[in-house]
Design a protein with these regions (language model features):
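N-terminal active-site segment of His-dependent metallophosphoesterases
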Residues: 24-102
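Conserved aromatic anchor
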Residues: 355-368
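Extended active-site neighborhood of metal-dependent phosphoesterases/phosphodiesterases
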Residues: 100-188, 193-194, 221-228, 244-279, ...
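Short acidic, glycine-rich surface-loop motifs adjacent to enzyme active sites
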Residues: 190-212
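Binuclear metal-dependent phosphoesterase catalytic core
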Residues: 247-343
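Beta-strand-rich modules
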Residues: 407-425
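Active-site neighborhood of phospho(di)ester-bond hydrolases with catalytic His/Asp-centered motifs
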Residues: 49-51, 87-94, 120-127, 200-204, ...
Length: 427
């Protein structure tokens, strides 16, 4: 398919997505402030969730170091808490770059050297686990996975009374249709056991039309299956789309959470110009904590700066309650506000080693951090540079933007910077 034509289709779907959630999300209500975490919230379960590690097999690869840090940083965090358990790590697919044996060797090595007693590592297969073999026999992907990880490509595990269900692609590395009946059966077992508690499901692609990235990196069979189970909290990757973005959580008939990537987070500003890497190094994973009543706390961890994001935290009480949708697309959009710069904000100008001009300015923030900035540089009435750039909201430690606008002749210029939120509020 022609790439331009595909982008047009994605843009049309994105528009339909916006209309769909603009109506559907009203069912859960709007203008509802998400609840604060109760002071007496006491976890009985703690687990980390990541995806898209894309190990190359090289020990000094940044992704390998981040996957290692996921274990060690979480153990360090748990040691400071009243509940000190670190019960599980979920890897929602694409732990390898292409499903090659040296990549699995590195995956297993990191787990063997860093995963301590009492922590389970739960894994499902992503599309990259089949890439090396697709041209002649994709089913080999299963054989290699079973050799290094587990004989079971689909799993149902109970940890501290909570159900975890992991679903891999079929052996073609592309579809889930053949997995639907198994998934339904396992969900029914989990609901029969714990009808009023969250059931954690993970697979590689997003359920279609749920979270950020689910327009063009998704699977419809997964979506239609999960719709019947309000207890489900689903974790998915594939798109690499920024997990720090509020659109990466969405409550409809079930709860969906996008996992971003331990490689590089990505963004897509309009579904026409295509996916873009976020500026600089970016990587993140979720830390989930659950109490005895089934209330869930999600906190996002920056795997590059080794710290939690200050404002990316979601407390979800009564997950199975169909009427409680604080994190629906419609509600989050309704409480969003246009980002503003600090009152004393200024733009400073510097020159890089190539002689190109760099604009430096502080981050803008509304209810959520700015997602992008629309920047125009003018010489008199003439526009000499104009672009929309992704913000650095994919990093927990950065407070200032640095935007290269190329080589400019000496003279006076007028710079206009308009920040926009993830829900396109601003200007």
């Amino acid at each position: 398919m022609n790439i331009y034509f595909r982008r047009i289709i994605n843009a049309v779907i994105a528009s339909a997505f916006t209309c769909y959630f603009g109506v559907y999300s009203l069912v859960g209500g709007v203008n509802k402030q998400p609840p604060e975490v109760p002071e007496d919230f006491t976890p009985v379960l703690r687990f980390a969730v990541c995806s898209d590690v894309h190990l190359s097999g090289e020990e000094d690869q940044a992704n390998a170091k981040r996957f290692t840090a996921l274990y060690n940083d979480t153990y360090d965090y748990a040691a400071t808490q009243s509940y000190k358990g670190f019960d599980a790590v979920i890897v929602a697919g694409d732990m390898t770059g292409g499903g090659r044996e040296p990549e699995y060797v590195m995956f297993k090595k990191i787990i063997d050297e860093n995963c301590r007693e009492g922590t389970r590592t739960l894994v499902c297969m992503g599309n990259h686990e089949f890439i090396e073999y697709r041209d002649y026999d994709a089913t080999i992907g299963y054989d290699v996975y079973k050799k290094f990880v587990s004989e079971d490509v689909d799993t149902h595990t109970v940890i501290n009374g909570y159900h975890f269900i992991g679903v891999s692609y079929a052996d073609d590395g592309k579809t889930f249709k053949s997995k639907v009946e198994w998934l339904k059966a396992e969900l029914d077992k989990a609901v029969a056991d714990t009808p009023d508690k969250p059931i954690f499901v993970f697979q590689h692609p997003h359920p279609t039309l749920t979270v950020y990235g689910s327009v063009n990196w998704s699977d419809l069979d997964i979506k239609t299956t999960l719709m019947k189970y309000p207890q489900v909290v689903d974790f998915s990757g594939h798109s690499h789309y920024a997990s720090c973005d509020p659109r990466s959580i969405n409550q409809t008939s079930f709860t969906s959470v996008g996992t971003g990537s331990l490689g590089a987070l990505m963004s897509n500003l309009d579904y026409i110009s295509g996916d873009v890497d976020m500026p600089g190094e970016t990587a993140a994973f979720w830390l989930a904590e659950v109490d005895a009543e089934g209330n869930l706390l999600l906190k996002l961890y920056d795997a590059v700066s080794h710290r939690f994001f200050d404002d990316v935290q979601y407390y979800i009480p009564n997950v199975a309650n169909k009427g409680t949708k604080y994190y629906s697309w419609g509600n989050l959009r309704s409480i969003d506000t246009a980002p503003q710069f600090p009152q004393d904000a200024k733009v400073s100008v510097s020159t890089d080693s190539e002689g190109e001009t760099v604009l430096n300015f502080p981050n803008a923030k509304g209810y959520f951090d700015a997602e992008n900035y629309r920047i125009t540089v003018k010489s008199g009435a003439k526009t000499v540079w104009s672009d929309t750039v992704v913000s650095n909201y994919g990093r927990a430690d950065l407070t200032e933007m640095a935007v290269n606008v190329g080589k400019l002749d000496k003279g006076e210029y007028t710079v206009t910077i308009a920040p926009y939120s993830p829900y396109s509020k601003g200007g």
